[in-house]
A protein has these predicted regions:
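Amphipathic cytosolic juxtamembrane alpha-helices at the membrane-cytosol interface
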Residues: 1, 73, 86-90, 95, ...
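Transmembrane-helix boundary motif in ABC transporter permease subunits
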Residues: 66-98, 111, 262-268
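Generic hydrophobic transmembrane alpha-helix motif, especially the helices
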Residues: 99-137
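Periplasmic/extracellular loop-to-transmembrane helix junction in inner-membrane transport proteins
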Residues: 1-10, 26-68, 233-241
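Interhelical loop and adjacent transmembrane-helix boundary motif
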Residues: 43-46, 50, 202-252
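C-terminal transmembrane helix and the adjacent membrane-cytosol boundary/short C-terminal tail
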Residues: 147, 151, 155, 189, ...
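Hydrophobic alpha-helical transmembrane segments of multipass integral membrane proteins
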Residues: 57, 61-69, 73, 77, ...
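Transmembrane alpha-helices
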Residues: 67, 146, 168-206
Length: 275
């Protein structure tokens, strides 16, 4: 028994050491190359300067453009399947399909997005095509996460509310949602992290351009590189690893912040619910 515990501790320590080494290596390589000019300007080949402001804005546009569609669709589908649908066989088939779609490599979504959104629908290579591709890619995850959160609410609470004369939607809004809102919000925040870190699908659909767009004038019709795509371009195509590590450090910091926010939000609602 003692030897088993020692082995598990060694595995845990090794895993933690590898993660810490990776984080430290990226930060040490990347942070010295980050400056205000680097964050607030766009690249210029005339002055040989590098800036990632277009990539930051394009990342923000992609995240917002994806969330606008994936959150209402994913949460709405989960509510219907969990609270309204009566044919359990169809519900099971949809859940199985969602689980399968969640495991498909993102580059396949990129290929499908390029053929459907860019070519068939005529979006061309654009942020709009990239956002819609990420909607399809993240919809199963948001739906299943919300479903699992809804299922954590005891059925007795629903039955008690029905017994008091509450309607279906009122029960969902006043009983079910408050009982699982922490899980739903946490799942949505983690979906933001997945959108933020996506690159393969966007290589096919959103393009590599370092352009700044006015979203209120141009919408998402122009091509643009996100931070992850820019990292690939600088590291693989241009061999500029200093810039690549700087972008990697920024992405790593954003990922840590997103996971921290998800944890804090979950704990806040759990504490509020227990009062």
């Amino acid at each position: 028994m003692a030897s088993s515990c020692t082995a598990f501790r060694a595995c845990a320590a090794l895993t933690a050491a590898l993660v810490l080494f990776l984080i430290a290596y990226v930060l040490i390589k990347g942070i010295p190359n980050i400056s205000w000019e680097f964050l607030s300007t766009k690249p210029s080949y005339l002055t040989d300067s590098v800036g990632i402001l277009p990539d930051i804005l394009n990342t923000l546009y992609i995240v917002l453009g994806t969330l606008v569609w994936v959150l209402p669709l994913g949460v709405g589908a989960a509510i219907y399947l969990t609270e309204y649908a009566s044919n359990h066989r169809i519900v099971g088939a949809i859940e199985y399909a969602a689980e399968t779609l969640s495991g498909i490599p993102s580059i396949i979504y990129g290929l499908v997005g390029m053929l459907f959104f860019c070519n068939f629908l005529g979006f061309q290579t654009s942020l709009q095509a990239g956002a819609m591709t990420l909607v399809i890619m993240n919809l199963p995850t948001v739906m299943r996460t919300t479903q699992e959160s809804l299922k954590t609410v005891p059925q007795s609470l629903r039955e008690g509310a029905f017994g008091l004369g509450a309607g279906k939607w009122r029960v969902i809004r006043t009983v079910v949602f408050p009982g699982c809102v922490d899980g739903i919000i946490t799942g949505c925040i983690l979906a933001v992290g997945r959108i933020l870190g996506e690159s393969a699908a966007l290589l096919f659909t959103a393009g590599f351009a370092h352009n700044i767009y006015n979203i209120f004038v141009d919408g998402l019709s122009g091509a643009g590189a996100t931070l992850t795509v820019a990292l690939y371009v600088y590291a693989k195509e241009q061999g500029d690893f200093e810039i690549a590590f700087a972008i990697a450090a920024i992405l790593m910091a954003l990922t840590v912040i997103i996971n921290l926010v998800a944890t804090l939000v979950g704990k806040y609602y759990q504490k509020r619910r227990s009062i």
